[in-house]
Curated annotation (Swiss-Prot):
Sites marked Not glycosylated: 285
Catalytic activity: a sphingoid base + hexadecanoyl-CoA = an N-hexadecanoyl-sphingoid base + CoA + H(+); sphinganine + hexadecanoyl-CoA = N-hexadecanoylsphinganine + CoA + H(+); hexadecasphinganine + hexadecanoyl-CoA = N-hexadecanoylhexadecasphinganine + CoA + H(+); sphing-4-enine + hexadecanoyl-CoA = N-hexadecanoylsphing-4-enine + CoA + H(+)
SMART domains per UniProt: TLC
Gene source species: Mus musculus (Mouse)
Protein name (record): Ceramide synthase 6
Membrane topology: Multi-pass membrane protein
Length: 384
């Protein structure tokens, strides 16, 4: 075990040339980031999760009810043993051939069977009230952590001149505010990693999981080798648009369409400006070029920058999706459902007739009535 730890914490990988871990031990004069500091993130992540449960129950839910957001779920599918067996044991999305077979077996029309499967799938979806509470929690946290980051960074020299991220590196003392900011962010992303498995399931689950994982790696990496100064710039930039998105979701759930549209436009502008403009031109410029000039490259420097480039790749992907929904918004006149939406269709869009005999109605091969579908957005949908 000692050999494995020695290999993992190899100074030639983690630190610049001619720097050792002994040089970064805490002294009476200065405190530096220590790897063991990060253990604090785990109990704090649990505390954040518990605070979230309390917040959603006693603050977000009353707010949702005050806005007339009901807890009613989607329409319940009519009990049917045959269809239930197919749904649970075979497929939740029957193809056209199976639909025709079930239609003959039950003497139902195909459209009624499609509706049954859609309603049955939607039974497992959370209510609008649940979505509102989840978004209100994220809005509150993102707003707080972004506000804290701005208040902290405006007092630092590296906000105004990024070369200060590398002067005297890695012998840069760790301040209490920087330590709190880092541990809070790391704890929140650990809580997201866990809660993602219990939250509303979205189609880009894998992408978001990769995003959270990359963020945790970045925070951990930059803390351990004391790249925390530039790390605070990355964190604050990537927090800047999140509160606007969650606010747009809340407006959408409350059916304040004009407010939703305005907030989404504000989110899109801030997101694209910060992640496609400021981040590469300001942050990547300092991590790739200014640090090379002042400190020089070393193995963990390459890994850190590769993680930042991975994050930028996700930013480009999400920006493309945001532009796509923005174009559709212009053509349709309002923000609509998107590809991350966990709702396949609204029961209000369907005929409410009960399953009956077959008057073969027109259907599409994908099992919808031809009017349901998804519009794409970015890292989080407006209607998810």
């Amino acid at each position: 075990m000692a050999g494995i730890l020695a290999w993992f914490w190899n100074e030639r990988f983690w630190l610049p040339h001619n720097v050792t871990w002994a040089d970064l031990k805490n002294t009476e004069e200065a405190t530096f980031p220590q790897a063991e500091d990060l253990y604090l993130a785990f109990p704090l992540a649990f505390c954040i999760f518990m605070v979230r449960l309390i917040f959603e129950r006693f603050i977000a839910k009353p707010c949702a009810i005050a806005l007339n957001i009901q807890a009613n779920g989607p329409q319940t599918a009519q009990p049917n043993a045959i269809l239930e067996k197919v749904f649970t044991a075979i497929t939740k999305h029957p193809d056209e051939k199976r639909l025709e077979g079930l239609s003959k077996q039950l003497d139902w029309d195909v459209r009624s069977i499609q509706r049954w499967f859609r309603q049955r799938r939607n039974q497992e979806k959370p209510s609008t009230l649940t979505r509102f509470c989840e978004s209100m929690w994220r809005f509150s946290f993102y707003l707080y952590v972004f506000s804290y980051g701005v208040r902290f960074l405006k007092q630092t020299p590296w906000l105004w001149n990024t070369r200060h991220c590398w002067y005297n590196y890695p012998y840069q003392p760790l301040t209490a505010d920087l330590h709190y900011y880092y541990i809070l962010e790391l704890s929140f992303y650990w809580s997201l990693m866990v809660s993602q498995f219990t939250d509303i399931k979205r189609k880009d689950f894998g992408i978001m999981f990769l995003h959270h994982l990359a963020t945790i790696f970045l925070i951990t990496f930059s803390y351990v080798n004391n790249m925390a100064r530039v790390g605070t710039l990355v964190l604050c930039l990537h927090d800047s648009a999140d509160a606007l998105l969650e606010a747009a979701k809340m407006a959408n759930y409350a059916k304040f369409q004009k407010m939703c549209d305005l907030l989404f436009v504000m989110f899109a502008v801030v997101f694209i400006t910060t992640r496609l403009g400021i981040f590469p031109l300001w942050v990547l410029n300092t991590t790739l070029f200014e640090s090379w000039e002042i400190v020089g490259p070393y193995p963990s420097w390459w890994v850190f920058n590769l993680l930042l480039l991975l994050l930028q790749g996700l930013n480009c992907f999400w920006s493309y999706l945001i532009v796509k929904i923005a174009c559709k918004t212009v053509s349709k006149g309002k923000v609509s459902k998107d590809d991350r939406s966990d709702i396949e269709s609204s029961s209000d869009d369907e005929d409410s007739e009960p399953p009956g005999k077959k008057p073969h109605s027109s259907t599409t091969t994908n099992g919808t009535s031809g009017t349901n579908g998804y519009l794409l957005t970015g890292p989080c949908s407006v209607d998810d």
